[in-house]
C-alpha cells in the first residue's frame, strides 16, 4: 500500500482528533457484536452474551485499546508494516488461529467508528488515507498465514 505524504498527514490529523483507547474499545466491541462467530477468539473475556455486555466488557475495551495503540505505533513504520507486524501475524496465525478475514472486518469497523466519531470532519480524503492504512495493516497481519 502506497501512502503519499498527504495520506500520512491525514492519518496523523485523524489520530490527533480521537481518543485512541476509546475508539479501539468501540471497534472491537462492534466486531464481536456484528460478527458473533468472532466471540470464539475471546472466550476467556467473560460475559459476551449481549451487545450491552460486550460494549461494557472491560477486557474487550482494554484489548480494543491495545489494538488501536498498535495501529498508532504502526504509523511510525508505514514503510515496513509487514516487518512491524511480523511477530503478531505469526501469533494470530499459529497460537490463536484467527481467520485473516477478521483483520479486514476490523478495518471496516474502524472506518465506521471514525465516521461516527468525526462526522463531517471525516472527509473523503481522510477516509481514503485511513482505508489505505488499514489495508496495509490487514495485509501485514495476514502475511504470517
Curated annotation (Swiss-Prot):
Name of the gene: HBB2
Q: Which GO terms describe its biological process?
A: hydrogen peroxide catabolic process
Gene Ontology terms, MF aspect = haptoglobin binding; heme binding; metal ion binding; organic acid binding; oxygen binding; oxygen carrier activity; peroxidase activity
Q: Return the similarity comment.
A: Belongs to the globin family.
Q: Which UniProt keywords apply?
A: Heme, Iron, Metal-binding, Oxygen transport, Transport
A Gene Ontology cellular-component term: haptoglobin-hemoglobin complex
Pfam families reported in the protein's UniProt record: Globin
The identity of this protein, by name, is Hemoglobin subunit beta-2
